[in-house]
Amino acid sequence: NRRNCGSELITNRKKYCSFSCIYCECGWNKIDTSIQVPLNKREDIKKALYKKLSESTKEFNTTIDSITFSGNGEPTLHPDILGIVEDVIELRNQYCPQAKITILSNSTNLVREDVFKALQLIDNPILKIDAGTERMYKLINEPVSCKFEQIKQKLIEFGSKCIVQTLLLRGECKGERIDNTSEEEFTAWLEIVKQISPKSVMLYSIDRETPEKNLEKLLIPELEQYAERVRALGIETNTY
């Protein structure tokens, strides 16, 4: 789920992701991520960001407070993600040192050494984990390949620098009951969060149209009930 984070640097309307989440506003996956597809080149991204930052700060006197990697899919699928992150940090330091760099990631590529390193360099690595068990992970996220245990262990290894992002929902998909708010599921998820000990947690629910129609949106008062259980662990938690 990608919420609006400001003006877009490079527009790409095609979804390219290692998940096919039942709640994703971008719809079901239509591109096979196991094959090579044309992506924006590192040097083109750097040029576009240079143009944007130099124009915004010099000509329009705009204060930039955030640079965000998001888009319609998983940004860490880019083979040059480490170099791109290093370029962004270089330009940020030059033109808007006050700005925080954020990435929204589904955590699947933390198994790649270059991705793990790249995300460690970022101010706000927002890393997703929507389930407490392998079964619910497969039902909600419909992953291409990455195993739940791999994601869990890499998030624990990543530790307190990350911000954990989780979408809570209930519903039905393909005849299966979906519910990551049940006592069993939420307790399992909570134990993982405890082991990660993140900087903070973001709990949110469905905001836009979803590809699977039989899903229930949780309202803020209910999200707050779950947030209180996370706060009881001493972890800052926000609801959206």
Label the model's feature ranges.
Residues N1-G27, S66-F69:
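N-terminal pre-triad scaffold of radical SAM enzymes
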